[in-house]
Amino acid sequence: MRLVEIGALSADSDLVLWEASCETISHQISLKLARKEGGLMEIFNSVVASLPRKSDSFRFSAISSKTSWESAHRNLLENLTKTVPVLLENGWKKSPDFQKNSLIDLFSLLEDEDATRIFKMTQESRSITEDDVEDYFSMFDKKFDRLLTYGAPQFENCVRDSPMRQKYANLCVEVLVAVGASVKNAQKITDFLEKQSMKVSKIWMTRIPEIFEKITNFYDYPMMFDVAMALDGFPLRKVFLARRFALQSILEVFIEMAPNTKYKVRERVRQELEKASRFVGYASEMGHDNLLSSFSPKIVSSIEDSKHILEVETIERLRRCGYLENLGAPLDELVRAQIASIREILPHFSAEFVHLALRHFSYDSEVTLASLLSRENLPLELLRLENVELRAGIGSGEWPPLDFTASDEIEKLARADKRAKDEETRKNNETKSASNLFSLAPILSDRPPSPPVDQQAELRAHAEAYRTSVLTKLQKIRADAAGPSSPSEKIAVDAENLVPLATSKKYSALNSLKISEADKVAIRPTYNKYRYETPNDGGNGVYDDEYDDEFDGREFNIERLNQELETSSEEDEAGSSAPPGLSQPPPYQGSRGGRGGRGARGGNRGGAPSADGYTGGHDRQMKEKHKSDIKQRGADRKKRGVY
């Protein structure tokens, strides 16, 4: 029997089912240990793989919210620990269900005291060797590649009205939580094995900057809104918390493990840090400049470039969300007075920065002033723009702004509606069921419940308006991404009209080749006019043989009217008296080496003009008409049996 798994965004009903599963498996383990039955290895592998760790703050915080759930988790872990000595005594590797990675993975579940006791048992029985540990971390390194191939790619390719969209949205959150929890588990196992004097490879941590960059690319700002909109109740805060949990976990693990790296691992870490990236910028903003610079002096320039990248991206996001509109010069007199009063106390802050801080704290001047003084409650993006010259711009408003208060209210209403529907379903089932003489159903009051006092009507209205606004803007983002933008579309930036350039070679080339039917009809006469060369074209100056590559170097002689033409001998004499230094090209000598007498047929094709006075080129229409006659004659001969 496998343990029921709970999701990162699990509901109370899921946790109740998980609690029952924990109690059932704990009872099974106790019975098998008492009766000395088999099947413990299968239970051990499934429980170790799915039991939540403390590193998974999403699942473990949900379990810790209720005493019974926490007790079920603790009892199952204790019974699981009791199975290890029995499995080792009976021959761990002799079992057909043996998985050595499960035994190593167990150390991420246990406390140090229990983990040390079990590790000594494994060393006595030689159940874990250094080769097993190396294989475990090699598989863990590959886990990153598999992990990032799920979630975001499937969600982006899913049709909006598809029933699988909510499933893929849940998968995106699961991937983010799994990345953060897996990195923390790997750090815990590495530290524990090093304390036990076992050699452990840390090569897996050199990929942390790459993973950090991929997460920020896949799960960007609009993607988070889209995922939250596809989930029940619009849990925007939890979706952003999952992304922050993943990024913060891998950053903390890297900062804690990087100083102790050596040799090959340290060299690869240095190469990753010398590249300008969001990871280097975030690590510098968290105050780890000295640690980064200890790997190489070149990282100092990488830190500056990374910070500049983050500043540009932050300003662009604020502009798209509309936060830069009328920045520093608000239309409201009260807001202007708030900015002036704060700048009297803190004159080193610009009016634009103070206005941006007021917008973040919902125009609460006291909270804004206290946050600017202490700097502890300021968000990272505001600290990033503290020394940047901000300018008011036209806010496009194409991205929805963050409003966790409204999203929390939407989620609360969705949960209340779900509870009401479940209660109504339960009552309907009780009514339809046959009434027995003795019923074990709880006695419900016949008195109708008193109507609730709605004291948050304004907050609910704001939340619903926010949800509608987010949905509208996400639909516009999808529409812009689905269809290529018109090349005539212009964007107003700093009072200038800029035409967006096509960044994709494929689509820009396709757009340049698009011709309407009206244009095709208009250019068809011109195309047909120059399609064939005919004797009546009047093109006497055109060379008469297009297949001849001989160059005629003779000069054109312009004769006067009513004057006899020179003879051919005179022309030859005039040609021989060419100025020195200009050599005449040799006459054409046949084609490709020639085959006997057939070389004469391939000689100089420039002949005398025809007797009928026609001096133009070949009749292209006749050639096109009869060009396949030779093939038809050959086919007739083959049919008659000549060949």
Curated annotation (Swiss-Prot):
Coiled coil (residue ranges) = none
Signal sequence segment: none
Q: Where is this region: Disordered?
A: 561-643
Composition bias type Basic and acidic residues, residue spans: 617-635
Query: What GO biological process terms are annotated to this protein in UniProt?
Result: regulation of DNA-templated transcription
Q: Which GO terms describe its molecular function?
A: ubiquitin binding
InterPro entries for this protein: ASCC2 (IPR052586), ASCC2_CUE (IPR041800), UBA-like_sf (IPR009060)
Composition bias of kind Gly residues appears in 591-606
PANTHER family attached here?
ACTIVATING SIGNAL COINTEGRATOR 1 COMPLEX SUBUNIT 2, ACTIVATING SIGNAL COINTEGRATOR 1 COMPLEX SUBUNIT 2 ASC-1 COMPLEX SUBUNIT P100
What's this protein's name?
A: Uncharacterized protein C06E1.9
- Record the organism: Caenorhabditis elegans
Lineage summary: Eukaryota, Metazoa, Ecdysozoa, Nematoda, Chromadorea
